[in-house]
Regions:
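Extracytoplasmic catalytic-loop and juxtamembrane helix elements of membrane-embedded
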Residues: 68-98
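Hydrophobic/aromatic-rich transmembrane helices and adjacent perimembrane loops
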Residues: 158-177
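C-terminal multi-pass transmembrane helix bundles with aromatic-rich, positive-inside signatures
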Residues: 174-187
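Transmembrane helices and adjacent periplasmic/lumenal helix-loop junctions
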Residues: 14, 18-40, 63, 152-161
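Aromatic/glycine/proline-enriched transmembrane-helix motif characteristic
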Residues: 86-153
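Alpha-helical transmembrane segments of multi-pass membrane proteins
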Residues: 1-5, 29-32, 57, 143, ...
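Membrane-interface transmembrane helices that cradle and orient dolichyl/undecaprenyl
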Residues: 2-15
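Perimembrane helix-loop-helix junctions
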Residues: 32-59, 70
Length: 187
């Protein structure tokens, strides 16, 4: 994911897409970075580089995944089945709220919908701010916000997910003290 952002910064949209596609083939979160790229390209009116990046991302993801999808369809789909059938992790915001508010355990399908709606609403808010801000936000700032929104609204929380935010935080948070404070609290 970080390599994809670097390639984008160096104005190499196809390479950015290939690197994001490879990242997405191992863990889906690099796909989240396409949203901020789209919003910034929309803001500047330059959608062609985004189209190249998105196309290269999809093509790379397919090249990596298609053989496994065709040869071992049940094994390939297991990740998606597991994630759609699982409930809230003990460390997720939903489980924390449930323990304080006394919410009942939600069925996985309900939790999936709630998580998706909250994440989509957060992304819409981030996109609106990005499109209407007086100064164009930096890509790393938007990526940090989108990935953080995904982690906060997701029903699954693993401590290693914080590592997804580290390179984005280093690029997005300009003040070292604020960055170190965030990293200390997160640890």
């Amino acid at each position: 994911a970080a390599g994809g952002l670097l390639a984008w910064a160096r104005r190499r949209p196809v390479l950015a897409g290939v690197l994001l596609g490879l990242g997405a083939a191992t863990k889906l979160y690099p796909l989240l970075l396409l949203g901020p790229l789209f919003v910034l390209c929309l803001r500047t009116g330059k959608l062609r580089p985004f189209a190249k990046t998105a196309g290269a991302t999809a093509a790379t993801w397919l090249v990596v995944n298609l053989p496994i999808m065709l040869l071992y369809p049940a094994g390939w789909a297991e990740f998606f089945r597991l994630n759609s059938d699982r409930g809230a992790d003990p460390d997720s915001i939903y489980n924390v709220l449930r323990s304080f508010v006394g919410w009942p355990n939600w069925a996985p399908s309900t939790l999936n919908l709630v998580s998706l709606v909250l994440f989509a609403a957060a992304c819409a808010g981030i996109g609106l701010v990005a499109l209407t801000a007086p100064r164009r936000p930096r890509l790393a700032q938007l990526c940090f916000l989108v990935v953080a929104a995904f982690l906060l609204t997701n029903k699954v929380w693993s401590p290693q997910y914080s590592l997804w935010l580290v390179p984005l935080a280093v690029l997005a948070i300009p003040h070292r003290r604020a960055l170190l404070a965030w990293m200390t609290v997160d640890a």
